[in-house]
């Protein structure tokens, strides 16, 4: 039996969109680029061959379109892990919950999420404007404890 999500657990707007992002399930691609600043959504989407839809609500801005024939959504998260938590939960709900019946879909869809952003740096050999690709990240806010057990392999201390 599928899990049911009460109105208090999953707020769906009158137009069938999720509460914060204002996206409807059909507007979300399986591949999502996350950016912090809402202004960067248009910058990234300017590389799309075609724009299918654009939705804005507060600090959340999304554009879905195609790039090299692949359907992609660019979604802003705003600032902080609390906003990222809201965004990722609503993106997952859009793909894995039937908004008409408020139940889990029988087949789970795993989204591909790629975060593009900026950060400060402390290393002299890495001047401003340098492109950096992280393999891992570490958070000291404790949010990961709600999603993965402490023994999760990718979260273990990295020895240098």
Q: Where are each of the predicted segments found?
A:
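Extended interaction regions within the primary functional domain
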Residues: 10-14, 96, 149-151
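Short, charged, surface-exposed secondary-structure boundary motifs
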Residues: 64, 142-149
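Single, functionally critical "micro-switch" positions that shape active/binding sites
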Residues: 36, 116, 157
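Conserved small/polar residues in nucleotide/adenosyl-binding loops
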Residues: 153-160
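N-terminal short beta-loop-beta anion/metal-coordinating cradle
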Residues: 2-89, 100
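Hydrophobic alpha-helical segments and helix pairs
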Residues: 88-145
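Juxtamembrane/interface motifs at transmembrane-helix termini
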Residues: 62-63, 93-94, 154
């Amino acid at each position: 039996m599928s899990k049911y999500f009460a109105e208090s657990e999953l707020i769906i707007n009158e137009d069938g969109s999720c509460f914060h992002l204002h996206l409807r399930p059909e507007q979300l691609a399986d591949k999502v680029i996350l950016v912090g600043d809402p202004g960067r959504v248009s910058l990234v989407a300017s590389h799309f061959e075609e724009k299918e839809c654009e939705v804005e609500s507060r600090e959340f801005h999304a554009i879905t379109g195609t790039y090299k024939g692949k359907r992609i959504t660019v979604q802003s998260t705003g600032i902080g892990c609390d906003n990222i938590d809201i965004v990722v939960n609503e993106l997952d709900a859009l793909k894995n919950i039937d908004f008409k019946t408020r139940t889990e879909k029988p087949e789970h869809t795993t989204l591909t999420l790629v975060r593009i952003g900026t950060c400060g740096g402390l290393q002299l050999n890495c001047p401003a404007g340098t492109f950096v690709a992280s393999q891992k990240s570490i958070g000291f806010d404790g949010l990961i404890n709600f999603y993965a057990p402490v023994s999760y392999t990718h979260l273990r201390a990295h020895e240098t």
